[in-house]
Amino acid sequence: MPVQRRSYRYPEDYEDVGAFLVRTYAATAAGPHRNWLRPRWEYMHYHPAIYGRESEFERCGLWTDGNRIVAAVHFEHRMGVVYVQLDPMYASLKRDLLTYAIEHLSGEFKAGPAVHVYLDEDDAGFGVVAESLGFAKMSEEQAEVTTRLPASRVPEQVHVPDGFEVLGMDEDDDVAKVHRVIHRGFDHDGEPPEDELDDRRRKLSAPGLR
């Protein structure tokens, strides 16, 4: 059976796409095209920017081989800003994925309707396909940097200063505390805005959060 293309159905396909990302971790970790990690997929769905817009998910595309998802093309929070997830065994789909983005995921920008697709800079072949379809490389200022820490490099024990302790969200799920930590972690001064607490609570409601 040839690879089939269809719309992403939320919430029915949500877990299956997450499993697809996990399945392709090992195959894509070294590039040239690196897929999202599953936590970002969850964050995308539980971010307040998407609240009330869930019907727009049907514009995203999935490619399946039998019952297996082998590729996905989707926006995150802004229509027209697009990401590609691809099983490396199906590299021949690259042109189809980008064509789908052009036809279904265009957004409105200051210069008019457009599609911005983030591709891994190590995947020169994907870049060639994009250029053949009329895409132009964005400036370095518009690049998106992703940092990953291999599990093998995570220390078994974490030492913190006296008076501090490391707790999991299952031990202390005080949303206000987490909101304050993240606010300070992004180098903001003062206390976090209280009117953002519900938005933070929504983000923290993602089922895979630890």
Model-derived regions: residue spans:
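Long, contiguous binding/interaction regions
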Residues: 18, 25-29, 39-45, 76, ...
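Flexible, substrate/cofactor-facing loop regions flanked by secondary structure
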Residues: 30, 155-210
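Acyl-donor-binding surface of acyltransferase catalytic domains
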Residues: 69, 76-162, 170
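Alpha-helical elements of the RecA-like P-loop NTPase motor core of helicases
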Residues: 15, 127-128, 176
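Conserved donor-binding loop and adjoining core beta-sheet/short helix segment
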Residues: 6-15, 21-108
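Exposed alpha-helical structural elements
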Residues: 16, 38-40, 125, 195-199
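Conserved N-terminal entry element of GNAT/NAT acetyltransferase domains
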Residues: 1-28, 136-137, 145-172
